[in-house]
């Protein structure tokens, strides 16, 4: 099994480290040719945290947005953390257009405020158990469609969800030593 990690900006190296701990090979995807070269060998894709506007702009400039969107729309498993969640959202409040727009969720960017408002907590995540959660100016999911399964909430705000083969978190599991969510994603990839 091999997992692609979008490596345009953000915490891609941290996700690679988590996969390595699980014995899973990963490949960094930096441009369209790179994506096309590896796509048929991949079992899934991770969209890391970072700055969603910058990543979205790079996806468009590198002509990666539509091919990746088509792959996700056809059922290709994807795990979006923080900015990756925003990229997958069908609607982003206070923003005219979405990026991939494949997941039936409405997202509020930077809902947890400035960098100084970042925090750490632990909470239950359906199908995974109690896990550590690191929030860095994280988004929140303000509403979900009927087919979206809410996996975790913190202070009555949705912070993790799944729709079919799409898994998202508004926090950064790659910044902890807990492998549970990455294992959960690998299980999604195995049955896809």
Curated annotation (Swiss-Prot):
Gene3D superfamilies cross-referenced by the UniProt entry: 3.40.50.880
InterPro entries reported for this sequence: Class_I_gatase-like, PdxT/SNO, PdxT/SNO_CS
Entry superkingdom: Bacteria
Residues that coordinate or bind L-glutamine: 50-52, 109, 136-137
EC number of this enzyme: 4.3.3.6, 3.5.1.2
This protein's pathway: Cofactor biosynthesis; pyridoxal 5'-phosphate biosynthesis
GO molecular-function terms, A-Z: glutaminase activity; pyridoxal 5'-phosphate synthase (glutamine hydrolysing) activity
GO biological process: one example: glutamine catabolic process
Reactions catalysed according to its record: aldehydo-D-ribose 5-phosphate + D-glyceraldehyde 3-phosphate + L-glutamine = pyridoxal 5'-phosphate + L-glutamate + phosphate + 3 H2O + H(+); L-glutamine + H2O = L-glutamate + NH4(+)
Cited CDD domains: GATase1_PB
Keywords: Glutamine amidotransferase, Hydrolase, Lyase, Pyridoxal phosphate
Catalytic site positions: 82 (nucleophile), 172 (charge relay system), 174 (charge relay system)
Coiled coil: none
Keyword Transcription: no
Any Pfam family hit: SNO
GO CC annotation: cytosol; glutaminase complex
Similarity-based family: Belongs to the glutaminase PdxT/SNO family.
Record text on subunit structure and interactions: In the presence of PdxS, forms a dodecamer of heterodimers. Only shows activity in the heterodimer.
Role according to the record: Catalyzes the hydrolysis of glutamine to glutamate and ammonia as part of the biosynthesis of pyridoxal 5'-phosphate. The resulting ammonia molecule is channeled to the active site of PdxS.
Record-given protein name: Pyridoxal 5'-phosphate synthase subunit PdxT
Taxonomic path: Bacteria, Pseudomonadati, Pseudomonadota, Gammaproteobacteria, Pasteurellales
GN (gene name): pdxT
């Amino acid at each position: 099994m091999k997992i692609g990690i979008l490596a345009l900006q953000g915490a891609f190296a941290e996700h690679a480290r988590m996969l390595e701990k699980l014995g899973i090979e990963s490949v960094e995807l930096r441009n369209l040719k790179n994506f096309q070269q590896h796509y048929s060998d991949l079992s899934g894709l991770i969209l890391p945290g970072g700055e969603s506007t910058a990543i979205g702009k790079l996806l468009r400039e590198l002509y990666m947005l539509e091919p990746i969107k088509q792959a996700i729309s056809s059922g290709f498993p994807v795990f979006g953390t923080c900015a990756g969640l925003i990229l997958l959202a069908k609607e982003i409040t206070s923003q005219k257009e979405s990026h991939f727009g494949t997941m039936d969720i409405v997202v509020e960017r930077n809902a947890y405020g400035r960098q100084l408002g970042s925090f750490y907590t632990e909470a239950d995540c359906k199908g995974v158990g109690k896990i550590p959660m690191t929030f860095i100016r994280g988004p929140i999911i303000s509403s979900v469609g009927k087919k979206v399964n809410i996996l975790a909430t913190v202070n009555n705000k949705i912070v993790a969800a799944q729709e079919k083969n799409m898994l998202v978190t508004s926090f950064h599991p790659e910044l902890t030593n807990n492998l549970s969510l990455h294992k959960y994603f690998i299980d999604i990839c195995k049955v896809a």
